Amino acid sequence: MKFTIQIIAVYALWTGATASFSAQNSCTAQSGATRASVIELYTSEGCSSCPPADKWLSSLKTPAGETGVASGAIVQAFHVGYWDYIGWVDRFASPAYTTRQRQQAALGGQSTIYTPQAVLNGRDWRDWHGSGGRLPLGKEPAGASISLRQVGDDQFEATVTPAVGASSTWSAYWTVTEHGHSSKVKSGENAGEFLQHDFVVRQYTPAGDYTAAPKTPQKLVWRSIAATPGHARQINLVVFDPKTGKTLQAVSAAC
């Protein structure tokens, strides 16, 4: 399904805070020497061709009910609402996610957006359905290093350090993704379907644009406001080149 839409302004909320926090409840993540792959799926409960893509995304989870993916990729399902008019409102959708999809498309030279769309490291990835569950994990050196830690119940901080030879300008965003959501669709193209979702983006927060010399660390602070009891979640931080959309590095932690 394809749809052309005007860009919607994104209003980001981010805050820094400090608090005493039990070390035994904290979690951390440290990036590696190679760039992590970032997969974004743009999907909708109102799209009849989206359930197979949602099922494929769920197949990337680790076994035995663990969170994350065995490959180490960062996986995110952005639900969009531009098919809500067909008759079913996607409760996970946000205009900010549509805006992000549109921005990604513009960086890749696309004039339209569609669902389901997979984006790999900032570029349209149409061969996701032919991957056979194998993710194209490259060995490209990381453009930045990231160290993330939890400093409060819903408070996080990270240090981003650009690599030598990488772009001096970078941007970042945080997401909260949750597993194990489901919906019984009562109307629209998927009427009567029972849909199951993993890696659902419940919070998306742009973290700003930065210019820094190589090896110059930048501290980011953030508070999560999204948490659904009973659902395992991931805290993700993605650093990318704002001129191309290309991923520089990313980390994910089950917090």
Enumerate the predicted regions with their spans:
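Active-site-proximal cofactor/substrate-binding loop regions of enzyme domains
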Residues: 11-14, 21-112
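Sec-dependent signal peptide recognition
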Residues: 2-10, 14
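Aromatic-enriched hydrophobic runs in primary sequence
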Residues: 3-4, 38-41, 49, 53-56, ...
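Short, conserved sequence motifs used for protein processing/export or organelle targeting and
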Residues: 90-117, 121-255
